[in-house]
UniProtKB/Swiss-Prot annotation:
Feature type site, description Plays an important role in substrate specificity: H228
Keywords: Amino-acid biosynthesis, Cytoplasm, One-carbon metabolism, Pyridoxal phosphate, Transferase
PANTHER family referenced in this protein's UniProt entry, alphabetically: SERINE HYDROXYMETHYLTRANSFERASE (PTHR11680:SF50)
Listed name of the protein: Serine hydroxymethyltransferase 1
Reactions catalysed according to its record: (6R)-5,10-methylene-5,6,7,8-tetrahydrofolate + glycine + H2O = (6S)-5,6,7,8-tetrahydrofolate + L-serine
One BP annotation, GO: tetrahydrofolate interconversion
Gene transcribed to yield this protein: glyA1
Family note: Belongs to the SHMT family.
EC number in record: 2.1.2.1
Amino acid sequence: MLKREMNIADYDADLWQAMEQEVVRQEEHIELIASENYTSPRVMQAQGSQLTNKYAEGYPGKRYYGGCEYVDIVEQLAIDRAKALFGADYANVQPHSGSQANFAVYTALLQPGDTILGMNLAHGGHLTHGSPVNLSGKLYKVIPYGIDESGKIDYDEMAELARTHQPKMIVGGFSAYSGVVDWAKMREIADSIGAYLFVDMAHVAGLIAADVYPNPVPHAHIVTTTTHKTLAGPRGGLILAKGGDEDLYKKLNSAVFPGGQGGPLMHVIAGKAVALKEAMEPEFKVYQQQVAKNAKAMVEVFLSRGFNVVSGATSNHLFLLDLVSKNLTGKEADAALGRANITVNKNSVPNDPKSPFVTSGIRIGTPAATRRGFKEAEVRELAGWICDVLDNINDEATIERVKQKVLDICARFPVYA
């Protein structure tokens, strides 16, 4: 018999200490990694539930195991909410991650050796969009498209590459691009050569759900996303489509299960269902609007302090600081800010002279800081502190002074009150 009073703290002190230290780190550090966010206690309640015990290979109403009548309800709730939130008529909530969702799309629609057009990782793309070090870059012939001198996606280049190479699929989406993507233009280019348009909206799904960023679902053949990041749910993936192509939907379902995964994680799917419901609330829209406002406010401060922001602006939740003119590496900046309890990530910038392990930039995002209640006044102050550290990167007194300010503001704006 399992007793409900069993707990980690009494049983595994070493593990519990590490878990508790991470709780403290999250409360006492300002999180500016664009792909990170804080999920709600409701989502964590779902993820810590007894649903983790249930195997449920298959889909609602078509399972390979018995005893699935209640997890069928859970999964159907998640499916229905995903479709309603993003205006889709198909949703698969089973992918364990965004990467697995992406590979399900590739598996469903491509053959090894097929040509795809994806955003250059060095220009803001994602590993799974055809990077040579990723399986997507090894299985398929990848033609990268990029940004122009203004830092915007070069659609003329994209169209020319599409005409020249005739890819079977064009991949939209990004991990470090601060502009607005013209999904309709991308579909026009895809249609001109008879290609699929596949959009990975992982970074901006929350903004899209709140009508703060354009929705690709009406334009793309298939859309994937993670359920964390701006959507603020559990870590996991989601596939969406619209248009009524039942043959496509069957291919996508088969590519997820049995093609790429076995049993779904029902406790995580329950967390997705909760997060999708939360994303329909009025306060979620206000939150996403503030995420975008905060990113713009931070960019204004960096520009006023003489820092180079790639493209000079942001229209979503993130932006890149190009530190080449400051003679700093992203690795140095990341480490110095970390000592001040400000968490960012080093990131390559366009035409970066440094390796991906060093880089010449940092990526900054506002979802997590906004989640804890920061508004324009707080993020402007925060951006100023970041400038202070980067302008005095070897001055430990400056770093310590900023750290104390960070600790103070974190105490005033706790993640979990």
